[in-house]
A protein has these predicted regions:
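Transmembrane-helix signature of polytopic, membrane-embedded enzymes
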Residues: 104-129, 330-333
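Hydrophobic, aromatic-rich transmembrane alpha-helices
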Residues: 105, 287-334, 338-342
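Membrane-interface transmembrane helices that cradle and orient dolichyl/undecaprenyl
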Residues: 113-118, 150-172, 180, 204-211, ...
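Short acidic/glycine- and proline-prone juxtamembrane loop motifs at membrane-interface regions
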Residues: 137-145
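Membrane-interface alpha helices of multi-pass inner-membrane proteins
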Residues: 169-187, 191-198, 233, 339-347
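Short periplasmic/luminal acceptor-recognition loop of GT-C membrane glycosyltransferases, typified by
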Residues: 422-423, 431-485, 491-514, 540-543
Length: 558
């Protein structure tokens, strides 16, 4: 009986310790994230997520009531934040940071036993220190992708070690695949790369066991069928939901057809050729390394720009060290697979702007992993000085040098963090939560001239005004030339039937060199005929439907 009581006490202590560690991780991550809260103002892609979330939270249907070429996960996350009370950029970010802190804490606790505390906890810490680059602090799909790609790499390393996938592994892989692809379509490329890496490991195992072709196929199926089922399940559920809502066809058209067939015409063909999408990141990575090394010499100076260059080069160095270490310690073929996955994570960039954050996250995991391995190595070298070989001394020297570089980098970020916190405390900046109460702000009049659930016609790619006014858009298929090309007939038909009373419209609106009057002449003519500016001098972009103009002017002039 005493033995059982002791076991129970030990179990309870273990659970308490786990909970305390998890809470500490959450607090540390959240405090670090708060340091970048006001690092950049509202951003187009971020505001788009807000608006989509507001539409969903108000009962609207994605891709039917809110036209978008993006995948749905970020909109649904923002919808939850809106329902929790988020009413400004400040509040949306604050709530989202809580979500990020929970996700990073979960990853740290889940993989702490397999990878060690330094690697599991350190990955999130290192990643967050990279969010001081402009726009990387925003609520973007890249934030979700970053966590998911780290999970996929961790699961691959575990599979390469164990050669098996249990249900726990499958659920983690399924969640990472669904959230990353559901947040951004381009996640398909790194997902494909890591899937190939998993397959390579299993094929190597079949070759090692000298299986025949048919036996190898059976073995591969036996290994991966659970993962296939768990990965397909959430996508099947999503398809079922959209089919039930009657939005499945428009979802496929918006998220796939527009991105593959129409949008590439406006971005130099990017994404139109599938084969090149798997090759270009490799080429771009090589060019990024060459450019970084060149600028490291030619652009020397004590500036933020040069610090960014140094940071980029350190990331490339971490990649190479990890690849070489893994190839030497584990398997060179698997190392090559990891190389390709790393490059595919940088499909949108490698140079510390917000599109490159998934690549940065994977690199930060590699840095934390190497530090964890070096720490274990130091423990094995805890012997008398004369027993340490020259090779071991050299390895220790390299490890110490790496620790110094990492320490300096962390100190630099700590200085930035303190400065950011000071800015928040001094300015009390809350990012437009009070704009709808300021009569000199257009958001006030959009809010005043519309009812609570009334929609506003938005014709630009900057939805910030609607976020400030706490109003949702009347579709958004006019704000970009590729979206108008995709939805012109539907947009004009809807306007003829049910035109909003208030519109945000700029006749001179130009996006990437495309004038609205040129890519949407029918719409421009319709606006000229049916809408009039409320106050052309003070708010030239605020238009009122002609039959509501008299009432609006009376309210405005009170």
């Amino acid at each position: 009986m005493k033995m059982k009581n002791k076991e129970y006490e030990n179990t309870q202590k273990g659970i308490a310790k786990q909970m305390l560690t998890c809470i500490l991780c959450f607090v540390v991550y959240l405090i670090m994230l708060l340091g970048v809260l006001n690092r950049s103002p509202g951003f187009t892609d971020e505001s788009d997520n807000f608006i989509g979330g507001m539409v969903v939270a108000s009962g609207g249907r994605m891709y039917r009531d809110f036209v978008s070429q993006h995948m749905p996960v970020m909109y649904h996350i923002c919808a939850v934040l809106k329902m929790l009370g988020a009413d400004s950029v400040y509040e949306f970010r604050l709530y989202f940071y809580v979500v990020l802190a929970v996700m990073w804490s979960f990853v740290a606790m889940h993989y702490k036993k397999q990878f060690g505390q330094i690697t599991a906890v350190g990955t999130g810490v290192f990643y967050i220190t990279n969010l001081f680059t402009f726009y990387t602090c925003c609520i973007l799909a890249e934030q979700v992708q970053s966590i998911c790609f780290v999970v996929l790499l961790m699961e691959f390393l575990l599979f390469a070690e164990r050669k098996k996938l249990d249900w726990n592994n499958c659920f983690m892989i399924s969640g990472a695949v669904f959230l990353s692809f559901g947040a951004a379509f381009v996640s398909a490329f790194p997902i494909f790369a890591i899937a190939v890496a998993f397959l390579v490991v299993e094929i190597q195992e079949c070759i090692r066991k000298k299986y025949g072709f048919l036996q190898s196929i059976r073995e591969i199926w036996q290994t991966f069928w659970r993962a296939i089922v768990t990965i397909l399940a959430p996508f099947a559920l999503l398809i079922f939901v959209y089919a039930a809502e009657g939005t499945l066809s428009v979802f496929i058209y918006s998220a796939y057809t527009v991105n593959r067939e129409i949008y590439p015409n406006y971005i130099a063909g990017y994404g139109s050729r599938i084969v090149m999408s798997f090759v270009e990141p490799v080429i771009n990575y090589g060019m990024a390394i060459a450019d970084g090394c060149r600028k490291l010499v030619t652009d020397f100076g004590i500036t933020k720009e040069y610090l960014a260059i140094v940071r980029n080069v350190i990331c490339y160095a971490v990649n190479v060290i990890f690849w070489v270490y893994y190839a030497k310690k584990k398997n060179i073929v698997q190392a090559v697979a990891i190389v390709y996955f790393t490059m595919m994570c940088g499909t949108r960039g490698f140079t510390h702007e917000f599109h490159s954050m998934p690549y940065v996250a994977v690199t930060m995991f590699m840095a934390a992993y190497l530090i964890g391995q070096f720490t274990e190595y130091f423990k094995t070298c805890n012997v008398r000085e004369e027993q340490i070989s020259e090779v071991q001394k050299k390895k220790q020297g390299i490890c110490y040098a790496g620790a110094v570089v990492i320490g300096i980098t962390i100190c630099i970020y700590c200085v930035q963090y303190v400065g950011a916190c000071r800015s928040i405390l001094l300015t009390g900046q809350n990012f437009c939560s009070a704009q709808k109460n300021d009569v000199n702000n257009i958001a006030y009049w959009v809010h005043t001239l519309t009812d609570v659930d009334e929609k506003v016609l938005l014709t630009t790619i900057e939805p910030q005004i609607l976020v400030e006014a706490d109003r949702i858009p009347y579709r958004t298929g006019i704000s970009a030339p590729w979206m108008y090309e995709a939805f012109a007939e539907e947009e004009m038909s809807n306007l003829e039937e049910n035109a909003p009373r208030v519109a945000i419209y700029t006749p001179e609106y130009n996006l990437w060199g495309y004038d609205l009057t040129e890519y949407a002449p029918d719409f421009a003519a319709y606006m000229s005929e049916n809408y009039t500016p409320l106050d052309e001098e003070k708010f030239p972009e605020l238009y009122i439907r002609n039959d509501y103009l008299g009432v609006a002017k009376a309210i405005y002039n009170e």
